[in-house]
Amino acid sequence: QKDCSLPVDTGRGKGWFLRYYYNKNSKTCESFIYGGVGGNKNNFLNIENCCKICKAKNC
């Protein structure tokens, strides 16, 4: 769960991928656009995985 406390990181690259991250301040999973390269582990393919792993309150 320590990955859930990492800040959102859109990464590099020219990709346009809809992803989700856990916002530790609001304790919710939120969407962001991922560039496709780099970033960190607070990056989920769907909101369900974000909710399951980070136990967000908006799930």
Swiss-Prot record:
InterPro entries (alphabetical): Kunitz_BPTI, Kunitz_BPTI_sf, TFPI/VKTCI-like
Gene Ontology, cellular component aspect: extracellular region; host cell membrane
Keyword Secreted listed: yes
Highest taxon of the lineage: Eukaryota
Disulphide bonds in the chain: C4-C54, C29-C50, C51-C59
Gene Ontology process terms (BP): envenomation resulting in negative regulation of voltage-gated potassium channel activity in another organism
Tissue/organ expression: Expressed by the venom gland.
Record localization: Secreted
Record-annotated BPTI/Kunitz inhibitor domain positions: 4-54
GO molecular function terms listed in the Swiss-Prot or TrEMBL record: potassium channel regulator activity; serine-type endopeptidase inhibitor activity; toxin activity
Keywords attached to this entry: Disulfide bond, Ion channel impairing toxin, Potassium channel impairing toxin, Protease inhibitor, Secreted, Serine protease inhibitor, Toxin, Voltage-gated potassium channel impairing toxin
Site feature location: Key residue that directly interacts with the S1 pocket of trypsin: K14
Biological role stated in the UniProt entry: Dual-function toxin that completely inhibits trypsin activity at a molar ratio of 1:1 (Ki=136 nM) and that inhibits mKv1.3/KCNA3 potassium channel currents (IC(50)=129.7 nM).
UniProt cross-references to PANTHER family, sorted A to Z: BPTI_KUNITZ INHIBITOR DOMAIN-CONTAINING PROTEIN (PTHR10083:SF374), KUNITZ-TYPE PROTEASE INHIBITOR-RELATED (PTHR10083)
Miscellaneous note of the record: Negative results: has no effect on chymotrypsin and elastase.
Protein family: Belongs to the venom Kunitz-type family. Scorpion delta-Ktx subfamily. Delta-Ktx 2 sub-subfamily.
Descriptive protein name: Kunitz-type serine protease inhibitor BmKTT-1
Taxonomic lineage from the root: Eukaryota, Metazoa, Ecdysozoa, Arthropoda, Chelicerata
